[in-house]
């Protein structure tokens, strides 16, 4: 059985899919929104789960069941159309939805910056409005056509101002500005009583206008009688006294024939009825006024008989002047003379108008009165006189405002929501005439206006179709040429240039990836395979479905409805609404809630769209691709296994049987080879379930030589997964070796651990050789042991090696027991003659040693040279001895030692009977005395305060100071008092380091001390009691704040630390050791890291340990290479610095003379090893060589040529070393000349000489290799990284040092406090943000820090003055005498004094420095040092030790990029962030290319162009300089050079394309940038890794536009695609290794660890 590692996927490419590609992916169109039939539970045909499209639901069976079985594979059923294949097809087969209208892709529209908007030069808001068929709110004037002339308008047509302006450009017509009526009062009521008259006319805009006239009239009534003749007509004017009716005589009536009369008194008529024999008809006479009938009713009369009396009608004279009005009931007969005769009695009137009112009413308003109707004041005349929003011309407005003042208001502008459209095509002549361009957004009304003026010459659309048409019309090559031409004319820093560069980037990306812009608008929508969006039947016959199905259903339903509407030719407004809803549905399917309102389910939960499925913690990337589930794994509670060896674990039998099942079955099946394999497996599986004894036997056999992996979550570093040899045990819990608890951070209070079984021989080999717990004793974070004894083992060893308090006082001659060897002592102990802690004399290696038997026992397990018979071993002692064993004897001996310590520790912890009671917490009698003294001091401070000698702040600080000192005194005294009895159990625990510390002891037996309030400020009142005595109520209350804050912090800390680790891992995940040596001569200077408040962050010893020298180390004073006298090791370049070297170099210092005078013999061919210069001027034939000229070979040559034999010189042996004293003062002791860790240059040496300083202590200058200066193109090299701290050997190629660094920094993250300490001024620092927030602040290079900003020195110099006026200022004089002024911000304190020497980057005040400013002023080296110092400081303060190289790796990634300022002639764009190494490489290539220009010009003459060349000429036109396939001639070449074409693509003889440079190119100019870790992760070149980190949608959008290819260089990318990571054994150089599994006896395996 063999296996080898080969990576199969070389790269992953992501692009924008064209509609054709989407259709090609698809196996059929999804036409219905149905999913599963509720009766048959089978997928609906053409639905979202259709078997015809996505494949069969049952393995190898079609939908109708006609074809079933693997033999029919590939057959398409003619009945149901389903292809017979595996049901796995439902995981990979796509469908698609053919959209009835195009739809924009939300990622390309709502990205930042929006790709579509950038390409079209439109705003995202406009595009969104167009895509969503929206409108634009417009405020504008309105006009009314008053004279249309020869236009299609009619009088009264209403136009908006913009419409009018458009029409007015071409047509001649007259308009009047319109006023828009608002709030007209209604109804219209009469102001007076009177009679109504209605008139009607037309306005000048041909609109109807009604006049309601109400007249208030006084009337004189005159009666008129039948027969009277009226002298005046209706409406005639009369004057008082005029005769209206003249006097008239009325004759009597005589009967015309014989007959009978009927007299009707009511109607005042007489009717004569003729006799029956007569032929006459009846005649009726009206009786005039004043005439009487002379006959009775029914009386017979003769012809000629008088029937009535005669009378005279008097005249009627007008009593008043006025207008004659006839009553409506008056019955008149016109006479020939034009007058009227009254036929019936009635009345006429003389009217006088008292009042008249006119009411104009506009057309359409309902009138409520009739002509002639009488009305009262307040009666309604009409519903209204004007309608709301009625538009009036100026004349109309004036008319109405005259008649209705204050009864309505008008606005001159109208506010409207107008649908907007975008111009998709326009005739160039029209464009020039109107100034409208393609892509301009206009309102629908404006578009209609343009269409009427320029029919067929302008096109506008709305919706996604408009965007699609615009994108289709983009010629990317032309656009690129236009942008390039414009960029040449404008300054690169202008806003326009930045905008153009963004656009240029997108255009270039689209060209390079061969993507058509219109593909960003979807025509077909892919439907993901149904198994990725399943439906599951739940109880009650209902179905639970994935949100995606709901979103797809909504799209399909809307799409189908739109298709129907289009077929029916539905009105545009309905179609538009449906298109908008379709766009919304697709948007929400892709990214729910990005535009508009998110879709939610019935519980109000937002539905998960495609974007949500891939982004975030629960998304596809992080949950499924980076976090995979593991087969062959189990999980159980852990218990301690004290009997185990360090590389063993106890595995419960049942669990092992389950894990190793296939192996056990394989072993069982080897015995018999009869039945078919399938049935055999079933049979053996049953045996296993029955727990057959044979199975246990085989399990024992199978388990031999195999290791399992144990993992405890959270997996914070690589030690959280280790390999162990399993030992089968009874029970259900995994047994864990106690010493591996620290790396796992495990305890036995219910923790659970997971077991994983590596299957292949390769995996087993890797687990055994690299992951076995015995090889993981040393931590890769700091190189010290991590698998360490703790708790009872430490207590046991301490108890074993401790002594009585009088031990030191007993003289050897007074000791009773003396032994010749340890065996004798053991015998005496066994027989009870001596006790463990009794002093004895014992002979060891021929030496008599005073010790105790306990110490003899413990030393017997140690390597001989590490034994110490006079030492009590606590936690640190054990750690030291373990570390020394590892250094001298290697990892295997260390593992054995740890096991021995464990056994001894447990044994003697048991024997000690360690237990504690309340009495063991003893309180020192001196405690009260100390507190009383403190109280007195406090009283004094109070008195000073009361006298006004101290301010509030000063009093507070002094109080805090006193109580802090007191608390420390009480702590020390309590510990001393407890230690008087070394066997006190509490003391044993604390002193040994097994449990607890002095601080806890102080609280239990001393005093609790000062507490902080909720804001973090220290409370002045201390807690004087301890827990043994009990707290008072006030004390208890004070202490609650801290306790509560502690709990809150812990909760916050965990998540913050986890997130920090995640970002750190992401930023360095691809950093792997890629080569043994990058060959760089750069390095970093080893220095003592001190913070601004003189807190030593790191000693030189720790700084250089585990590194490789970058330069030789020279001995100060002699210039020879430094040699370690203890080991005879020379410190030349490439030497690895181990522990002992680091100690030697850090402690090495030497007093060296500042200056020495000497004579240089020029006849000997040497120049001094140290810096030297001429002591006097020397005249030579070639000229004067002045004194103080440095002596080098040039000077020596000149002097020899002048025949000079020897010269007087000054040697400065101190130059090139580093000051090792604290401070060197000038002769007046006012000014510091040199400070510790300052490099000595010539200027400083001379300054020391001037101040008569003869000699100083210096140390050699040490430069070590660092990842910060590594020049490997990918990853880092082994020499720059140095030692692999987990084994103290130079790191191997392939080690994933990035992830180790991130884990080393992230793992202790939870130990860092969240708290911002407010120390109340005890500490020398101001209130500095500490803990996790500070680390994050630095890694994220925050622009705003929580602390006030401090200032730093930009030069090397001396503080000459500090002015205290506001604002304070610090003045620094540099070495050349220049003065630099620094203004001190208000919230910080000055940290320097006058006369103090400062170095560049040194903090002058309290507060934190802005890292970006350091980078700008002092460059990347100082920035890296500051970051390292500040980040490391937080960890050191919390007692966490992490090697610098881990921080440096992160800082390297933060400083790895530079921002392009001027791209020169490269593909980069200004603002691009590019790795420094790449920029340097590109610039190098440009310089090399520039050298070949002349040669290339000659080469291309006579060759064919492989690509056409287009440029923009001086007139702004795009022209083609040369066509594809054209031959390059001298003339063409000159033309190309004239137009500044720098590169041409030529066809070579093999018809392949080659690029030739024909003009020199400009290099890239850039500036170093500091990236915060989040940004550094996102700027990572591989898109897969960046997408899986954060802002997934943004990263994928950008990558798709670019057509980005991920070459899978990092670790994450390879995990995502499911192949071996390019690190460790997966690194390329190991890829061909073959692993063979040879049958080996378990015995041999055991012997190795025996």
From Swiss-Prot:
Catalytic reactions of this protein: RNA(n) + a ribonucleoside 5'-triphosphate = RNA(n+1) + diphosphate
Entry EC number(s): 2.7.7.6
Any one GO MF annotation of this record: zinc ion binding
Gene Ontology annotations of biological process type: DNA-templated transcription
Binding site for Mg(2+): 747, 749, 751
Annotated binding of Zn(2+) 1, by residue: 62, 64, 77, 80
Entry's Gene Ontology cellular component terms: DNA-directed RNA polymerase complex
Co-factor requirement: Mg(2+); Zn(2+)
Keywords: DNA-directed RNA polymerase, Magnesium, Metal-binding, Nucleotidyltransferase, Transcription, Transferase, Zinc
Self-association and partners: The RNAP catalytic core consists of 2 alpha, 1 beta, 1 beta' and 1 omega subunit. When a sigma factor is associated with the core the holoenzyme is formed, which can initiate transcription.
Similarity section: Belongs to the RNA polymerase beta' chain family.
Protein name: DNA-directed RNA polymerase subunit beta'
